[in-house]
Structure formats: structure tokens, C-alpha cells
Amino acid sequence: MSSNDQQRGGVADKALQLVMEMKRNPDVLPPYNADLVRQCQKKIDELFHKNAAVVERMRNGLEHDPSLLQPRLAAMCHIRRCMMAYVNERKNRIRSFRWRYGGALPASVRNALCEAEIQFFNEYSSTLARFQSNLGEAGVNLLLHTAPPKTLFVQVRTLEDYGEFETSDGTQVQLTKDSLHSLPRQDCEMLIRQGVLELVH
């Protein structure tokens, strides 16, 4: 195998690592791999400029061997497809977090996002909030009742000191760590998603 083939193969393997990173972690979002993404971007630029230089020499009659043009183009397309698959899968998972946790991401999730992904999450949250507020006279919370309730009230345990919480009927509840409560399902669904409460079975 030539050194050029090894070089292209090495970068293609690195691009594939991005895809495999997501495949190996189907239930969690791994930290954004900025270093590997930059390496892939750099290699695409490098291959593009090499091809552009060959084309320019061919136009000037200085180059008569176009044999490396197609392999470089194939390598660029492969790297780009892997990067797009990586970004798209992360985007889909980030959107699902909005439905799972509401507008407040757990620190473990937020720390795995890059700045652009945090901005995307915030913009998606704002768009969803505007859409919900425009439904009906008082708006609709689409994050509630995502599954048919078996009972109107549920037993929950508080996982952290949260403080005072007001239910939809105006009842004040003090949520302290390890305390048990019977609350309306619709009032505590968001706190369950955020990890403040857990269902007691």
C-alpha cells in the first residue's frame, strides 16, 4: 500500500470513529469530539487543495496524471458523510432531551455539548415554547401527558432539596431530600424528568 493510500485510509478511519462513537453509546450522549472533527475538516481542506492544484496544472499542460483526483474526491465524500452522520445523530438526541428534561438540561448532558449545540438546544426550546403558547387561549404544554395516566395521583420520592413547590390546585408542598409525597401526575412530570423526583412503585 502506498503512503498516499495509508494517509487517506487513516483519516477515513478517524472519520468513521465519529460514527462508531455514537453507535457505541446509544443511551447517552458522549462529549463532542472537537479534536477529531477538526482533524477531519483539516483533511478535507488538504485533499481539496491538492486536487485543485492538480486541476490547475492540467489546465496549464503541466500535469498529465489525474489518477489521484478520484480517490481524493472519494475520501473527501466519505469523511464528509461521516461528519454529517455524527452531527445529525447528536442533533436528534439533543432534540429528544428537550422532550425528556424540559428546558433545564442536567449538568451531565450540558457538559457533553459544544457551544453550538447549546445554542441549538436553546433555540429549539424557544421555538417549542412559542409554538405551545400559541395553541388555544392559554397555550398547551406538549411535554405533559406523553403517555396515558393510570392514576391522577402518583407516589414520588424527592431526590434532592428542592424547596417549596406549588401544585396546580394551589397546594404548597415542601420538597426535601428523601421525602415522600402523593402529587398530581401532571404537576410532577417535569420534576421527574429533571431528576428532582422519582416514582415510587
Curated annotation (Swiss-Prot):
Pfam families per the UniProt record, alphabetical: PSF1_C, Sld5
Please name the GO terms of the biological process aspect recorded for this protein, alphabetically: DNA strand elongation involved in mitotic DNA replication
- Cellular location of this protein? Nucleus
> What InterPro entries has UniProt attached to this entry?
GINS_A, GINS_bundle-like_dom_sf, GINS_Psf1, PSF1_C
UniProt keyword terms in alphabetical order: DNA replication, Nucleus
Instruction: Give the source lineage, highest ranks first.
Output: Eukaryota, Metazoa, Ecdysozoa, Nematoda, Chromadorea
According to its UniProt entry, this protein's organism is: Caenorhabditis briggsae
A GO cellular component term found in this entry reads: GINS complex
Oligomeric state and interaction partners are given as:
Component of the GINS complex which is a heterotetramer of gins1, gins2, gins3 and gins4.
Protein name (record): Probable DNA replication complex GINS protein PSF1
Role played = The GINS complex plays an essential role in the initiation of DNA replication.
Write out the similarity annotation.
Belongs to the GINS1/PSF1 family.
